[in-house]
Amino acid sequence: MRTSQFPLNTLKEIPSDAEIVSHQLMLRAGLIRKLAAGLYTWLPLGLKVLRRVERVVREEMDRAGALEVLMPVVQPAELWQESGRWEQYGPELARLHDRHDRAFCLGPTHEEIITDLARNELKSYRQLPVNFYQIQTKFRDEIRPRFGVMRAREFVMKDAYSFHLDQESLAQTYDAMYVAYSNIFSRLGLRFRPVLADTGAIGGSHSHEFHVLADSGEDAIAFSTVSDYAANVEQAEALAPTAPRPAPTAALLKVETPGKKSIAEVSEFLGVPPHQILKTVAVMQTIVDDDGLDRDMFVTVLLRGDHELNEVKLGKVLGRFRFASEDEIERHMGCRPGYIGPLNLPAGTAVGPVYADRAVAVMSDFVCGANEAGYHFSGVNWERDLPLPQDEYLCDLRNVVEGDPSPDGLGTLRIARGIEVGHIFQLGTKYSAALNATVLNEEGRSQVMLMGCYGIGVSRVVAAAIEQNHDERGIVWPEALAPFQVALCPINMQTSARVRTTAERLYAELSAAGFEVLYDDRKVRPGVMFADMELIGIPHRIVISERGLDSGALEYKGRRDADNQSIGIDGVIEFLRERSESR
């Protein structure tokens, strides 16, 4: 393709509303343009990259035996009401009415639609297992769309849904999708990790996320230094300490800590490391009373000062909960936040159950709030000064940290940042039971089908790839994602017939050899030409100049290379093939 036929819509300046690198570079390189908040038009260059992702996804899904369908973006409210999600979904579900005042929504996901299709089309166990997939536009009315296509309101997604008669069949398809996803991200040239994950709002019993590794990633993932274990930090188990609790050595003291409320402030003021401070978090647990009505119960949660509360883990212990307000804390503890603790509770305070992370059990000579403004206790010890919570209240409630033992017993954990680009679930019967999606089993009896759900954020993959592959000059595409493989850059071709003739011949030969070439036939300075090609990230650049032709050579530079090199004109095709295959 010639640049005279394929205009480059590059920008010199970084748009002011672009916060992260991928958003900045997608705009500057001319991949996308913003239409409205969270809505983007894909320009020709960006669409070429998007189509490359789609092609690899489609090939691997087909190879895994999945069947492609295409479902409507607009979905009737009745199906969402039948599943119960019409009321459960928040304002991110965009709802609308047609001219007959019938309610619809713009699909953020397609569980209801595919389950309705399955219950109407699948009648017998002989039709199972089956796995349907689509590559389709989704819409979620995010309250604050950010980061370009990374968190847009409208996005392209591959979603697949499988149907099964038994758990063994579901597990087999789940494993096949795990392999297919690994193949997809490997073929795209991305560094990634599959990790154990929480099933979240989608539901189900088993789940893995696929993360592209990038320092800018929003998610923290934990992985073993020795084994293949990897999990989202929300899911990774923090093992119970194996060392015994040290014996007390310090006397219990009430110490003045004026204005020192945070762990960091108390640590610095008392000269005590954060892991020697007991942190008390107050929450309101939703429980059902004898009349079947919801009510709040005040609960305190204890953690080591250097550990973070894992809200997902706490939710699995308590069910529904929210963090207590300052007024609620004062009403129940007799003290404002910053000084609360499990020791020296004022008489008559209505403190509910006390839960503690397992690491708390081996603390000794620690510091905790004194339930009095401006004071803490030091030298606190379990059993001597206050009872340790019973075993049923000692739980894994924290995020793992670097250096923790791996939950599989092999090595220690490291923490990396990742961008979630894929998620697979074993859904079970959550949707099939709600929509009565059944088939006749071998005995001729009606049986609810088991379901699996498998998603890839196709447009998000493009942004994630840039977050992982860029430098100060622009995008550094993996070979499989680049919009073009080769940039052909003739210098002063308008004034040099020899350069122009050589460029035309090379363009024809490279194209015939199967390379996708961007032939820069613009009348621009070499510096502008090179800067644009580096910005848009083409892996291989060939420069044709009078000086090079005098010695029978071309100038080559790989996008990831630091230096240029000379190559013979006659061997350019074989050279590029070797370079492409080695990456």
From Swiss-Prot:
Top EC class, one word: ligase
EC numbers: 6.1.1.15
GO molecular function terms noted in the UniProt entry: aminoacyl-tRNA deacylase activity; ATP binding; proline-tRNA ligase activity
Disulfide bonds: none
Cytoplasm among keywords: yes
Claim: Hydrolase is one of the keywords in the record: no
Catalytic activity: tRNA(Pro) + L-proline + ATP = L-prolyl-tRNA(Pro) + AMP + diphosphate
Pfam families: HGTP_anticodon, tRNA-synt_2b, tRNA_edit
GO biological process: prolyl-tRNA aminoacylation
Domain of life where this protein originates: Bacteria
Protein's cellular compartments: Cytoplasm
PANTHER family for this protein: MITOCHONDRIAL RIBOSOME PROTEIN L39/PROLYL-TRNA LIGASE FAMILY MEMBER, PROLINE--TRNA LIGASE
HAMAP family in UniProt: Pro_tRNA_synth_type1
NCBIfam families associated with the record: PRK09194.1, proS_fam_II
Domain characteristics, as noted in the entry: Consists of three domains: the N-terminal catalytic domain, the editing domain and the C-terminal anticodon-binding domain.
Biological role stated in the UniProt entry: Catalyzes the attachment of proline to tRNA(Pro) in a two-step reaction: proline is first activated by ATP to form Pro-AMP and then transferred to the acceptor end of tRNA(Pro). As ProRS can inadvertently accommodate and process non-cognate amino acids such as alanine and cysteine, to avoid such errors it has two additional distinct editing activities against alanine. One activity is designated as 'pretransfer' editing and involves the tRNA(Pro)-independent hydrolysis of activated Ala-AMP.
Subunit and partners: Homodimer.
Sequence similarity: Belongs to the class-II aminoacyl-tRNA synthetase family. ProS type 1 subfamily.
Protein name (record): Proline--tRNA ligase
Organism expressing this protein natively: Methylococcus capsulatus (strain ATCC 33009 / NCIMB 11132 / Bath)
Gene expressing this chain: proS
